[in-house]
Amino acid sequence: CRHPYRIGGSGKRIAVIDLGIRENMILSLRNRNADIHVFPHDTTADQVEACSPDALFISNGPGDPVQAKDAIRCVSDLAGNLPIYGACMGMQVCGLALGGSTYKMKFGHRGSNQPVREKDGGIYITSQNHGFAVAADSLPDGCRVLFTNVNDGSLEGFGNQYLDITCVQFHPGARGGSRYEEIPFFDTMFRRLS
């Protein structure tokens, strides 16, 4: 988006930094009656804080995450001040904001059949479309791996309980496969905000 906008709801107030957000992610927030405040990629921490959000969500989007300098700065400024959730490129932005690094993958993850392993051993078939990844070993102390890719071992999700940051590399609004199913990322997010 080029200008901030709001999608009203009576639930938790969620600030969203739009890096190219997919409609199903907005629908996932709306399905939980969130009061959604969407901001463009170049928003500042002060602008986000002005809407008094319960949490910040960094969306998916195309391209090299190091180019999202304003979003990286915003996340860096807000880390530890409110819960932050990231998906897809949003995870990469959060990783960079914490001082981690990203790299261009030899073979990007594209399609609705990418298997990821949860830290407890469970497997999800996910939908993904990215050519960059966060280097797991570049993340600072306090970060823990939540998901890894079954095929290549790349990082698919991380969290930092001290800064209240949770991120996934896949599209959490849809599970891969022949029918629409949502991965419990947003349910977990709203349960933690309650």
What are these regions (language model features)?
Residues 55, 59-125, 133, 175-188, ...:
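Cysteine-nucleophile active-site neighborhood
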Residues 9-14, 120-123, 160-165:
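Beta-strand-turn-beta hairpins that frame and shape the catalytic cleft
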Residues 1-46, 50-51, 65, 173-178, ...:
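RNA-binding accessory domains that recognize and position tRNA/RNA substrates
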Residues 32, 51, 80-81, 141-142, ...:
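Structured helix-beta-strand junction loops
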Residues 122-162:
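Catalytic beta-strand/loop cores that center a nucleophilic Ser/Cys/Thr
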Residues 13-18, 126-127, 166-170:
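Active-site-proximal beta-strand elements of phosphoester/diester hydrolases
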